[in-house]
Regions:
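Residue-level structural signal for beta-strand termini and adjacent loop
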Residues: 114-116, 198
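Short beta-strand motif preference
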Residues: 100, 112, 124-126, 244-246
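Auxiliary Fe-S-binding modules of radical SAM enzymes
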Residues: 1-110, 167-174, 276-285, 290-375
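Canonical Radical SAM [4Fe-4S] cluster-binding loop centered on the CxxxCxxC motif
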Residues: 116-164, 168
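A short beta-strand submotif of the Rossmann-like class I SAM-dependent methyltransferase core
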Residues: 50, 141, 186
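Short linear Ser/Thr-Pro motifs
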Residues: 93, 127-128, 222, 247
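Conserved AdoMet/S-adenosylmethionine-binding subsite of the radical SAM
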Residues: 164-353
Length: 375
């Protein structure tokens, strides 16, 4: 087994920075209650008050927590931190998409993308790692290698920094704050299920009615196919709470081994067996993502095989014409080739959506997130 395959299948070491003080934004509501009971005993409702200030109001200073007792605020300020990510740059696409480059406390850069919805609101694509632990050959992030996992607070803070930016823009324009983040997808830098514990906690915070209060049906976690983690996702009932997307990208093990080395460990059959066993909300479907690569996986025979592979999953297929990036060994198929592939998939009885590239002029489209100065 080659070195790239080893990188693709081994869960990375946690690799989280060790803060001088704990960041309370990284605790879910139950954990915050336990922390306060241990360090500042008192009525349990105080933890909910603090949690709301941290995640609903996005407080940057403990002194702003006006309904929390002064003595409690003083203790929290001395024993914990409210550190936040820093927004380095914001790039704007001609289609309204924006790419945020954010800086961590230890100097690393990550990227997050804001995409206008067809209706109202925005979808935010967030990262779970600095770099990525996998080696998918069509993805620019893979060229960075794995640097470290993001802590829970760094995951949720991507949403909060974007929300604060949008609110400030509205205030500067003396307009109503209406450009709200309504959807979140874990499709940025990193493999979310290789950072399972931190992502799981972030989901709890983002969906908490006292926190960010984003409906679980509006959140999707994407994975390249870590079978044990998918099985855990199912056992813990996450499929009932949030959406699951599987990055499939091939219909044979030979091709998937080539474009996604993780397949050398868990073959397509094993992956789909795990997916079929994930209990999901009856109003949702598992999404299968298929990056269309010219001359690699875009043959009509691939479309026919997809019908056989996915027909009994009840899932939907997202076809994503490849988004080029420097050094990539692939090309985007011609539009007629894409259309023929989609039509063949529909003849197989599949529900198919073709994802229109968003933000590709600022390298913000699917598979394009990468950094020249990642450290």
């Amino acid at each position: 087994m080659g070195a790239s395959s080893l990188v693709a299948i081994r869960p990375p070491r946690e690799g989280l920075p060790k803060p001088a003080l704990p960041n309370l934004r990284g605790l879910d509501r139950d954990e915050l209650g336990e922390w306060m009971a241990e360090h500042r005993p008192g009525p349990r409702f105080r933890a909910t008050q603090v949690f709301e200030w941290l995640h609903r109001h996005r407080a940057q200073r403990f002194e702003d927590m006006s309904n929390v007792a002064r003595a409690d605020r003083t203790h929290l300020a001395e024993a914990t931190s409210l550190d936040a990510l820093t927004v380095d740059t914001v790039q704007r696409s001609s289609d309204g998409t924006r790419k945020l480059r954010l800086r961590t406390l230890d100097g690393h850069a990550i990227e997050s993308v804001l995409i206008p919805n067809e209706g109202r609101g925005l979808t935010q694509c967030i990262s779970s790692m600095v770099g990525c632990s996998l080696t998918c050959r069509f993805c620019a992030t893979a060229t960075l290698g794995f640097i470290r996992n993001l802590a829970t607070w760094e995951i949720v803070d991507q949403v909060y920094r974007a929300q604060d930016m949008l609110a400030q823009e509205a205030a500067d324009a003396q307009a109503e704050y209406t450009a709200r983040i309504t959807n979140v997808v874990f499709m940025g830098m990193g493999e979310p299920l290789h950072n399972y514990a931190q992502v799981r906690r972030a989901l709890s915070i983002l969906t908490d009615e006292h926190g960010a209060a984003i409906a679980g049906r509006r959140i999707t976690v994407s994975t390249a196919g870590l079978v044990p983690a998918i099985e855990r996702f199912g056992r813990e009932g996450l499929g009932q709470e949030v959406g699951l997307a599987i990055s499939l990208n091939a219909t044979t093990d030979t091709v998937r081994d080539h474009v996604m080395p993780i397949n050398t460990r868990w073959k397509i059959g094993e992956l789909l067996a795990a997916v079929r066993n994930v209990p999901i909300n009856r109003r949702r479907r598992i999404t299968f993502e298929y990056v269309l690569l010219a001359g690699v996986n875009d043959d009509p025979a691939d479309a026919r095989r997809l019908g056989g592979l996915l027909r009994d999953t009840g899932g939907q297929l997202n076809v994503i014409p490849f988004n080029p990036h420097p050094g990539a060994p692939f090309a985007r198929p011609e539009p007629a080739r894409v259309q023929a592939f989609v039509q063949q998939c529909r003849r197989q009885g599949l529900q198919v959506h073709v994802r229109t590239p968003r933000g590709d002029d600022i390298a913000a489209a699917c598979g394009q997130l990468a950094l020249e100065d990642s450290k």
